[in-house]
A protein has these predicted regions:
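Conserved nucleotide-binding/hydrolysis micro-motifs of P-loop NTPases
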Residues: 29-31, 83-84, 147-148, 156-158, ...
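Long, charge-dense
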Residues: 100, 106-121, 157-190
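Generic preference for flexible, low-structure residues
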Residues: 38-40, 77, 91-93, 144, ...
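Short acidic, glycine/serine/threonine-rich loops at helix termini
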Residues: 88-92, 152-155, 163
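Generic structural "secondary-structure junction" signal
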Residues: 127-134, 160, 175
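Gly/Thr-rich phosphate-binding beta-strand-loop-beta motif of the actin/hexokinase/Hsp70
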Residues: 134-159
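Non-catalytic, solvent-exposed interaction/assembly segments
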Residues: 1-131
C-alpha cells in the first residue's frame, strides 16, 4: 500500500529528478479483454517508440511488462539513467484517448493512446497526484470477542494497522481513576 512515507519518498526522489525521465502509466487490468495476452506491453512499446525513448530504458520497462505478473489495475513506471521505479496501483486512471484534458492532452514529449500515457522529459507526476487526491483513506474497525482490529483502505488496497490501540493494564485504570481530581467528592470527602 502506498503510505505517507512512500508518497514523501516519491516526491523527493522522482519529483526533484533532473534530466529526461520516462513517466509511463499503463492500464494492466487483467479483467479487461483488450489486455489479454499482455497487449498492454505492445501499446507501451509503441508509446515509447513514438517518444524516441532510449532503447535500454524501453527494454527495462518491457522486460517488466512482459515477464512479471503485475497484480494491479494500473502500473506506473519512472525510468531514467539512475532511476527505475514501478508502482502498482489497484485503481484505474483515466487513460483513454477520449479524455483530452489539459494535463492528458498530447504535447511535445507526451503520448496518449487508450490504456497508455507516456511522457519523456521532466517527471510527469500529475496522474499519480490525481489518484492520490481522488481516492480517500478509509478506516475500518473490526471488533470481536477477543480484540479490536483497525484496517486502512486506500487506493483499492487494505492493510491492518498494528499499533492503532494503546494497551493499558487494568490496574493502571484503577490508579488513574483514583488519582482523578474529583475523587474526594465521589469517595465521601477527605
Amino acid at each position: 500500500m502506498i503510505g505517507k512515507e512512500e508518497i514523501r519518498r516519491i516526491r523527493e526522489l522522482i519529483g526533484a529528478k533532473e534530466g529526461p525521465v520516462l513517466s509511463l502509466y499503463v492500464d494492466v487490468n487483467p479483467a479487461k479483454p483488450e489486455n489479454a495476452g499482455r497487449a498492454y506491453a505492445l501499446r507501451a512499446k509503441d508509446a515509447m517508440k513514438a517518444l524516441e525513448v532510449p532503447g535500454d530504458l524501453s527494454e527495462r520497462v518491457l522486460e517488466v511488462l512482459q515477464n512479471q505478473v503485475l497484480e494491479a489495475r494500473t502500473a506506473v513506471f519512472f525510468a531514467g539513467e539512475d532511476l527505475f521505479e514501478v508502482l502498482p496501483l489497484q485503481v484505474e486512471l483515466p487513460l483513454v484517448n477520449s479524455v483530452k484534458t489539459a494535463f492528458l492532452d498530447e504535447k511535445a514529449g507526451r503520448y496518449l493512446v487508450d490504456g497508455v500515457l507516456a511522457h519523456w522529459g521532466e517527471p510527469f507526476l500529475l496522474p499519480l497526484v490525481y489518484a492520490l487526491d481522488e481516492y480517500e483513506r478509509y478506516g475500518i474497525v473490526y471488533v470481536d470477542r477477543e480484540r479490536w482490529r483497525v484496517f486502512e483502505v486506500f487506493l483499492g488496497e487494505i492493510e491492518e494497522v498494528h499499533d492503532a490501540f494503546l494497551a493499558l493494564d487494568t490496574e493502571a485504570w484503577r490508579r488513574l481513576s483514583l488519582d482523578a481530581p474529583g475523587r474526594r467528592f465521589n469517595l465521601g470527602g477527605i
